[in-house]
Amino acid sequence: MTKVPLIRDYMATNLITFTPDTEITRAMNVLIDAKISGAPVVDQAGNLVGILSKKDCLKAALNAAYYQDWGGTVADYMSTQPETLDSGLDLVKAAEAFLKSQYRRFPVLSDGRLVGQVSRYDILKGLSEQWGAVEVNRAF
């Protein structure tokens, strides 16, 4: 029986993160400059407290358009209680979680602390490597 790799073997660990007190305008600029769709929000101990997504930032932008006020912090706009996956979860179970969810990536926790992030791409890559997917000619 082949052992299925774990999320920890394929997740990204070098993440952009925010704290709840980060100014929303600074966080938006970081997302734009890094060309990413969102980032985890952590407290001083590294515990995940939320996610700031482009959708959350659109709320701040609309607020600014209506009220001419770009004030606020990440805590004012972030999504709280995000869905997460455990770093010890195998890739098959992770794939099942992605199929049941609208999300393209999940924060990854170990003992309750943020240790990485895993995307659909990461899971697909890992499963492909595991079961020897046929190499496709990528020169289209």
Where are these regions (language model features)?
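A glycine-centered beta-loop-beta connector
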Residues: 31-34, 39-56, 98, 106-122
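Short charge-dense sequence patches
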Residues: 4-9, 23-28, 41-50, 76
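General secondary-structure edge motif
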Residues: 11, 25, 37, 57-58, ...
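The conserved cystathionine-beta-synthase
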Residues: 18-35, 42, 84-102, 109, ...
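Tandem CBS (Bateman) regulatory domains
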Residues: 1-14, 53-84, 88-99, 114, ...
